[in-house]
């Protein structure tokens, strides 16, 4: 029997504790879980891709079956095929997330009907955490330590120093 391989993607700009929770839970469902940082190289992100990748790798270091990969200018289904993933993992906080994800699921299924999508609901303590919310708090100098993993906080601090 072949390994169960999943792919969880996002921009992770920055990664939040909500992302971490979904990844930890998804890692128990698969033999191998790839966490794909998808980014637009022509768009200035909050954190450079190198910082995001390094922060994610540190935050996920305790999960032996999880590997962080970065991609740009590629469709998620193409990355999934390349990595041998047969399942996409998505996190849902609310009905708006479901509606947003449903359109992607439609296109992904049209492009590759053998790749399934599973949805993991956010835990109540993470329902209102978002990367954009964290960026907004940072913009106004607020403490974000309770919203992001320590390794991400370190990357943000290091980036601010430069």
Curated annotation (Swiss-Prot):
Homohexamer. Coiled coil: none annotated. Pathway: Cofactor biosynthesis; coenzyme A biosynthesis; CoA from (R)-pantothenate: step 4/5. The gene is coaD. The lineage of its organism: Bacteria, Bacillati, Bacillota, Bacilli, Lactobacillales. Its EC number is 2.7.7.3. This is Phosphopantetheine adenylyltransferase. Its main location: cytoplasm. It catalyses: (R)-4'-phosphopantetheine + ATP + H(+) = 3'-dephospho-CoA + diphosphate. GO terms for cellular component: cytoplasm. Substrate binds at residues 11, 43, 76, 90. The record marks 19 as: Transition state stabilizer. GO terms for molecular function: ATP binding; pantetheine-phosphate adenylyltransferase activity. GO terms for biological process: coenzyme A biosynthetic process. It comes from the Bacteria. Is inhibited by a series of cycloalkyl pyrimidines, which also show suppression of bacterial growth. Transmembrane segments: none annotated. Keywords: ATP-binding, Coenzyme A biosynthesis, Cytoplasm, Magnesium, Nucleotide-binding, Nucleotidyltransferase, Transferase. NCBIfam families: coaD_prev_kdtB (TIGR01510), cyt_tran_rel (TIGR00125). Reversibly transfers an adenylyl group from ATP to 4'-phosphopantetheine, yielding dephospho-CoA (dPCoA) and pyrophosphate.
């Amino acid at each position: 029997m072949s390994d169960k391989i999943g792919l969880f993607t996002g921009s992770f700009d920055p990664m939040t504790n909500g992302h971490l929770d979904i990844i930890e839970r998804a890692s128990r469902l698969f033999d191998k879980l790839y966490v794909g940082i998808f980014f637009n190289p022509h768009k200035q992100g909050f954190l450079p891709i190198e910082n995001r990748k390094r922060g994610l790798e540190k935050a996920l270091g305790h999960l032996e079956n999880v590997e962080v990969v970065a991609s740009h200018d590629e469709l998620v289904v193409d990355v999934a095929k390349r990595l041998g993933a047969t399942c996409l993992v998505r996190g849902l906080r609310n009905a708006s997330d479901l509606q947003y994800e449903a359109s992607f699921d439609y296109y992904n299924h049209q492009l590759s009907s053998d790749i399934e999508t599973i949805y993991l609901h956010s835990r109540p303590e993470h329902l209102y955490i978002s990367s954009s919310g964290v960026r907004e708090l940072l913009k106004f100098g607020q403490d974000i330590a309770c919203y992001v993993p320590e390794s991400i906080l370190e990357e943000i601090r290091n980036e601010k120093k430069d």
